[in-house]
């Protein structure tokens, strides 16, 4: 969800956007996304799971979980895609994606790389899942720092 929001902000405020980094951004709905969401729904039914989510979302944890699952699993959402917004993103983009992301295949960052309107670097992180910043923090920080330190194109 955060990656999609970041893409839309970069598109709407392109004059002010100097760079965009996405990590595990879902760009459309695919079967792997739906399978991951169904597995997440089952895991959040386990004792203590909602409490762990509350560490990040406080007393809104149940609402956040329901909004996320209900939206993405709704058949009316099946055709959603970032494709219309991506060509309007003109700042440099770094799209990081875990090779083992349980919510989306490498087709997501590839779509970002193919459609974004500015320079782009798509990087697949070997052995990482949906949260590479927690799974491989040193590697993610290094990649983001290198991207941000690179001279701006043009």
What are these regions, as identified by a protein language model?
Residues 11-15, 111-114, 142, 146:
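Short, well-ordered alpha-helices that flank and scaffold nucleotide-derived cofactor binding pockets
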Residues 119-121, 126-154:
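Catalytic active-site module of serine/aspartate enzymes centered on a nucleophile-bearing elbow/loop
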Residues 102-108:
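Conserved alpha/beta-hydrolase "acid-adjacent" motif
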Residues 68-85:
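Active-site nucleophile elbow and catalytic-triad environment of alpha/beta-hydrolase enzymes
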Residues 4-49:
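Flexible "cap/lid" loop of the alpha/beta hydrolase fold
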Residues 86-90, 115-117:
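Short, conserved loop/helix-junction motifs that constitute active-site signature segments
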Residues 89, 95-97, 101:
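Short beta-strand/loop motif that positions the catalytic acidic residue
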Residues 21, 94-96, 123:
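Hydrophobic/aromatic beta-strand patches that form the interior of the parallel beta-sheet core
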């Amino acid at each position: 969800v955060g990656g999609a929001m970041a893409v839309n902000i970069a598109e709407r405020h392109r004059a002010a956007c100097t760079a965009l980094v996405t990590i595990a951004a879902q760009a459309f709905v695919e079967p792997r996304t739906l399978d991951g969401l169904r597995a997440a729904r089952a895991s959040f039914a386990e004792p203590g799971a909602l409490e762990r989510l509350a560490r990040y979302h406080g007393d809104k944890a149940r609402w956040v979980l329901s909004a996320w699952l209900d939206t993405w699993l709704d058949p009316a959402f099946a055709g959603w895609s970032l494709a219309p917004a991506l060509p309007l993103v003109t700042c440099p983009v770094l799209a990081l994606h875990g090779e083992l992301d349980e919510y989306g295949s490498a087709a997501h960052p590839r779509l970002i790389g193919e459609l974004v309107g500015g320079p782009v670097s798509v990087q697949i992180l070997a052995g990482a899942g949906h949260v590479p910043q927690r799974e491989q923090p040193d590697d993610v920080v290094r990649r983001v720092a290198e991207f941000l330190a690179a001279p701006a194109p043009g």
